[in-house]
Amino acid sequence: MSERYRVLGENLKCGEKPKLAFICVHNSCRSQIAEALGKKLASDIFESYSAGTETKSQINQDAVRIMKRLYGIDMEQTQYSKLISDIPEPDIAISMGCNVGCPFIGRPFDDNWGLDDPTGQSDAVFEETIRKIHAKILELIFRVHFS
């Protein structure tokens, strides 16, 4: 795994940004948050995408509301629920967590963040999930940029 990040870091030095995909079943909450935070925090390090094996008609409204409040990001203006086949082939594929069933993406995941789905939970639970995703994005920046 660290070898993969080292190669991606070398490619970044040559001007090639790696593509990272954040995957969960419905692409409506955790993966959307990760895509939004990846774009906000790491757009100069990697390209962020999110997808699922199924889609929802809209992004989780609690996630939209809380991300707008915490980061000023309006996910409904910049993102939508997508299938895995709708995004470019990623260099790194990250599962958000399998508490709702792991989607099959045609290859093994490079990492599993093991995040519980906050859907239907309190704002405090959403905020904690968002903080965890934020920290994981910062770890990814370090792993890609400094490997």
Region locations from a protein language model:
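Short polar/charged helix/loop
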Residues: 1-147
